Amino acid sequence: MPASVYVSFDAPEGVPATPRRLHAALSAILDLPPGISPARAAKFPTLAHRPPHDAGGVKPYSLGELCHSESTFGVEVRFLDDRLVDTLDAWLSWGGVMRLGAGTEDDAVLIAREGQVIAQESWEELAQRDKDTAWEVRLVTPTTFSSKGNHVPSLSPATIATSLQQRWWTWNRRLAPPRIDRHAMASVLATQDFTRSSMVSLAMPRNAGQGRLSSRRIPAHEGHLRISGIEGAEATQVFSRLMALSAYTNVGSHTSFGMGVIDAVAA
């Protein structure tokens, strides 16, 4: 069951909270511990649902919105599998200490004050969310898409929908919307594009095993979109369901760097 949790932390001033570092800190909490294989973890209910740290593809958790104040730092964590909420809750019960930084003595140490489930819907409920026809879509973090290893320069409702449909298909195939018909979606959805292109540094170390140097930069989108569809059209209904799912996951590629967080509000 998809869910969203807000965690507030006691934090020092000037927390180095980049999306990439936050995602890395989350993975240390939610992924399988090093040395435990998925086959071994499958024998234990508390571990079976946790993803391998080095698994390719999209993780069943992601960053959401962030908020800052003088002494408090807040993070929204989105889940496609609410069993991981129990994992997060267990971590909170043990003190909820999170280290952020580059793995040095200068790392910031955050202490969780509380965690609260702020949204939760069943897959059946999401499948019925097909009545919305207009959305304001804000790109909370830079967002990029790729296909077969190549960057996709355009940003369209169909591109966003395809990414979300793939996530739904992975985590609940029975209720997932059908494969996106790009032509049908383009014919019924109108878009006002207020995004801009930016270059984002992946800052990947040379030993990451992906053939990229630390100076590797990729193009991404920032800004917002206004999308509206024809009421009653099947493609609009499919897009409505997928926009509902976007509250519990991210979109696009390079999500392990904290990219692809969107906020879609139905108008």
Residue ranges and their predicted role:
Residues M1-A267:
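RNA-interacting cores
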